[in-house]
């Protein structure tokens, strides 16, 4: 993996799919000269806990906004760096503070997301824990997803496509990307290369983490987490 997608662990197929979509979107941006109308405006990214759903969404958002002429998601341009830092003006992240995401919050979000991008190619909305959408909140989102603004892309993150996690009608309007549970080898490699851990320690943490990257990192670096 390269660029922003180095943040993902053990998801090479997902990287290929998202990079390919970002390449295609460059010719489809409303601010480009050769739009084809083929851009999917709603995506559903699913995967088990610790697989990197929100990370994948953020990497994809960066790739869509990337201004480099090389592979989208270069990780070096201002669009990529601000996207990954959470400061890009045209990327909004919805992280639930409570147990649910209701109607009022979604209405405010949809209104803001309907504006034209100020600096980027797209106005992107990342809804982490989309499984917390209330029925009313999901209906508000469904209406805009059915007839999306030309410059807006919604990235939804949920554990699965099960109706308990995402409304069937909303799921049917989204392009689905499924993350896998990272292998112990992939997790150990990241702990060694990115966190500088010794091989034995990294492999132990990866083996007992249950495929959860964050848990493996805590087990390897925080003595209290092992108690």
Region locations from a protein language model:
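Charged, glycine-rich active-site and insertion segments that engage polyanionic ligands
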Residues: 1-62, 82, 150-152, 158-227
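Conserved alpha-helical scaffold flanking the Walker A/P-loop in AAA+ ATPase domains
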Residues: 18-23, 30-32, 83, 103-124, ...
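Residues immediately within or flanking Cys/His clusters that coordinate Zn2+
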Residues: 42, 71-74
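Residues immediately C-terminal
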Residues: 51, 100, 132-133, 147, ...
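Flexible beta-alpha connector loops of hexameric P-loop NTPases
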Residues: 97-103, 130, 176
């Amino acid at each position: 993996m390269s660029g922003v997608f180095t943040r993902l662990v053990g998801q090479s197929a997902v990287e290929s799919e998202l990079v390919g979509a970002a390449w295609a979107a460059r010719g489809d941006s409303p601010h480009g000269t050769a739009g084809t109308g083929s851009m999917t405006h709603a995506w559903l990214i699913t995967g088990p806990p610790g697989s990197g759903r929100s990370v994948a969404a953020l990497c994809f958002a960066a790739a869509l906004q990337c201004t480099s002429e090389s592979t989208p998601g270069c990780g070096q341009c201002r669009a990529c760096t601000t996207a990954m830092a959470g400061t890009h003006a045209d990327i909004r992240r919805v992280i639930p503070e409570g147990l649910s995401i209701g109607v009022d919050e979604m209405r405010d979000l949809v209104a803001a997301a309907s504006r034209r991008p100020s600096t980027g190619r797209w106005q992107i909305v990342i809804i982490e824990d989309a499984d917390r959408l209330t029925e009313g909140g999901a209906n508000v989102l469904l209406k805009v997803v059915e007839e999306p603004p030309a410059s807006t892309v919604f990235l939804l993150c949920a554990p699965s496509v099960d109706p308990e996690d995402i409304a069937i009608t909303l799921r049917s309007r989204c392009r689905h990307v499924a993350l896998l549970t990272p292998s112990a080898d992939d997790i150990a490699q990241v702990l060694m290369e990115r966190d500088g851990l010794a091989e034995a320690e990294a492999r132990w943490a990866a083996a007992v983490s249950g495929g959860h990257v964050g848990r493996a990192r805590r087990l390897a670096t925080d003595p209290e987490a092992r108690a």
